[in-house]
Amino acid sequence: MPSCPVPANTDDIARFVMRIIQASLEHLDLITPLFVKYREFYGELPFPDSSRAFLEKRLRRKESVIYLAMPDNDDTKVLGFCQLYPSFSSLSLKRVWILNDIYVAEDARRMLVADHLMRTAKKMAKDTQAVRMRVSTSSGNEVAQKVYESIGFREDAEFKNYVLPIASD
């Protein structure tokens, strides 16, 4: 997929431009450190080797779509990423995309990185004729909730979601 130049916030436009690209296996070593930080943010142990293997499997099997935000002039730095998984709706008979992971590097926050990643994901969802995108976040993550709402996500008032943990005995 071609990259799309995206200006950061208006204060930084003169000195900083980012692009959003779809990740491939060649980006694996760039994504992994940020993916590890994402896992740590949610209280998980880093497991860099397992994290890399997980991402490699998703990319190799084409089981997810990962978008990367990168500085326009630097192919060695990732500002943020989002990972989407395909699903389907039996009721609407259409595709659904699950925005499962999104993370922005600490030094790239407040530059609209998450906003641009999600807008790219939304365009991909439209291009694949999806009926909707779904996202979940912790109840207390008000920053993420505001970002999601700013691009059009609405809290689901119709369905209550449940989780069934599967023990690994």
What are the language-model segments listed below?
Residues 87-89, 107, 140-142, 167:
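Short coil/turn motifs at secondary-structure junctions
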Residues 22-94, 100, 119-120, 124, ...:
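Acetyl-CoA-dependent GNAT
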Residues 2-29, 168-169:
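Conserved N-terminal entry element of GNAT/NAT acetyltransferase domains
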